Amino acid sequence: IWYTGIIEHASQTDYRRYNIRPDHPAIVKGKAGSPYAIKDYYDVDPDLATDVPGRMKEFENLVSRTHRAGLKVIIDFVPNHVARQYHSDAQPDGTTQLGANDDPNYSFSPYNNFYYIPQSELHGQFDMTGNALEPYHEFPAKATGNNRFDAYPNINDWYETVKLNYGVDYQNGGTCHFSPTPDTWTKMLDILLFWSSKNIDGFRCDM
C-alpha cells in the first residue's frame, strides 16, 4: 500500500508550540502545502498525527498494522527538490543539514547541495508576501525545483521548492561531476537508510 505525504512538508499550519519552524506563506502553495515540498526528510508530517509529539511512533505503529494485514508499505521519496525553507529539526545526531556547508558564491559546485544564483536576491513573479507582515527574502537565490536557474520563478513554476544538486552542472551542458562522490548522494543515502530502518518495504520516487 502506498502511503503518500508521510514525510513532513511545508505548510501554513502553525506548529511552533511543537518546536516546528513555521513556513513563510508566500512560498507555500495553498493552506496545507504540497506533499512534494519536503521541509524535513527525517520527520512525519504533523498534519497526519493524532498526537503530534508522538507522530513518528504513530507511523511505526501504522507500518506494523499494515504488515499484520499481509500488506507491504511504500512511501514517497522526493529526491529532486525540497521546500525553499528546508530545515530538519528531527535529523539524527551525526547528520548535517542540507546546504549547511554550501558555498553560495558558486552557481554550481559538486560539493554544494543546492544550485545558486550568486549575488542575486529571489525576485519571484508571484505574491512574495502572502498573508505575512513582511515579504519572503532569499539571498542568494537558489535554483527552483523545476530546473529554473534564475532568480525569477513565476506562478507556473515549482516556486515553493529548490533544486537539489547531485553533481550535474545543468548550465554547462549537463556535465557530470561524480568523483569524488557528491555530498548530496551521501546525505540522501542516510535519509533512505533512516526510513528503511522503520521497516518500510519500498519507496515511490517522485521527481
Could you say what each language-model-derived stretch is?
Residues 2, 74, 204-206:
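Conserved beta-strand positions in the central sheet of alpha/beta enzyme cores
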Residues 193, 203-204:
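Surface-exposed extracellular loop regions of Gram-negative outer-membrane beta-barrel proteins
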Residues 5-194, 198:
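Substrate-binding/active-site clefts of carbohydrate-active enzymes
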